[in-house]
């Protein structure tokens, strides 16, 4: 467990008006080699990858490969890894996709939230917990934003989660901020954006945005839930 920071209320108040780069710089100074970054290589992932590597070029970047990502995601990951010279750490579930399907079925086809949660625990949460442990992470940068889900609206920039600090430099950004940053720095967005996707995870539980969707995360998990478990 990392050394406890002083009052998180005070820290969040101090960081509230800071730019994302300044928040990352604070985190790099505070946590040093214990700081890691997670990425999904999703629609907007180039933003956090660029921000973080401008401050700390060799920061470990954790990518959880579920084995069910779209072809476009694997190609996008290769492009960004080469372009930004990422110190990429790829983690996967200890149970292969074929073995999981043989033992438990195609869990994503279920109408049960519990089955989706079981899938996410095996393919995402367990590998992430293992990655954080093996890399000796004391703090974890992510690109979540309040605009994305109801759960994320209540998040703070810095929180203590399961004995590690979760740090969210772009928590207050809106979609326009994301795309302005991508444009200003000539960064690519995920290829599926051009097909109407505003968020993308596994191929079987992501779809393009529709006119009647309440928010962008409604396009995930067939609308049964909004969080995969990594940021709960």
From Swiss-Prot:
The protein's name: Phosphoadenosine 5'-phosphosulfate reductase
Residues annotated as the enzyme's active site: 228
A GO cellular component annotation in the UniProt record: cytoplasm
Localization (cell): Cytoplasm
Record's function text: Catalyzes the formation of sulfite from phosphoadenosine 5'-phosphosulfate (PAPS) using thioredoxin as an electron donor.
Keywords, sorted A to Z: Cytoplasm, Oxidoreductase
Sequence similarity: Belongs to the PAPS reductase family. CysH subfamily.
Cross-referenced InterPro entries: PAPS/APS_Rdtase, PAPS_reduct_dom, PAPS_reductase_CysH, Rossmann-like_a/b/a_fold
EC numbers, comma separated: 1.8.4.8
HAMAP family associated with the record: CysH
Gene3D superfamilies noted in UniProt: HUPs
Protein's UniProt keywords contain Acyltransferase: no
Molecular function GO labels: phosphoadenylyl-sulfate reductase (thioredoxin) activity
GO terms under biological process: hydrogen sulfide biosynthetic process; sulfate assimilation, phosphoadenylyl sulfate reduction by phosphoadenylyl-sulfate reductase (thioredoxin)
Pathway: Sulfur metabolism; hydrogen sulfide biosynthesis; sulfite from sulfate: step 3/3
Catalytic activity: [thioredoxin]-disulfide + sulfite + adenosine 3',5'-bisphosphate + 2 H(+) = [thioredoxin]-dithiol + 3'-phosphoadenylyl sulfate
Predominant location: cytoplasm
Organism of provenance: Synechococcus elongatus (strain ATCC 33912 / PCC 7942 / FACHB-805)
Keyword Cytoplasm: yes
One Pfam family per UniProt: PAPS_reduct
């Amino acid at each position: 467990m990392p050394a406890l920071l002083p009052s998180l209320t005070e820290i969040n108040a101090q960081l509230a008006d800071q730019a994302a780069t300044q928040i990352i710089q604070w985190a790099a100074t505070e946590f040093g080699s214990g700081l890691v970054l997670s990425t999904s290589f999703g629609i907007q992932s180039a933003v956090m990858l660029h921000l973080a590597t401008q401050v700390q070029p060799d920061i470990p970047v954790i990518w959880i490969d579920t084995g069910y990502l779209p072809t476009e995601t694997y190609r996008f990951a290769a492009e960004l890894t080469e372009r930004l010279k990422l110190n990429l750490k790829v983690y996967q579930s200890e149970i292969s996709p074929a073995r999981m399907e043989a033992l438990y079925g195609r869990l994503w086809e279920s109408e049960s939230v519990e089955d989706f949660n079981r899938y996410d625990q095996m393919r995402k949460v367990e590998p992430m917990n293992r990655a954080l442990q093996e890399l000796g992470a004391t703090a974890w940068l992510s690109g979540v934003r309040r605009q994305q889900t109801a759960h994320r609206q209540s998040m703070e920039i810095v929180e203590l989660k399961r004995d590690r600090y979760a740090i969210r430099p772009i928590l207050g950004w809106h979609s326009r901020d994301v795309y302005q940053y991508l444009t200003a720095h000539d960064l690519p967005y995920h290829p599926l954006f051009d097909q109407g996707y505003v968020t993308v995870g596994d191929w079987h539980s992501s779809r393009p945005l529709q006119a009647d969707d309440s928010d962008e995360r409604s396009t995930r998990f067939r609308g049964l839930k909004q969080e995969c478990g990594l940021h709960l």
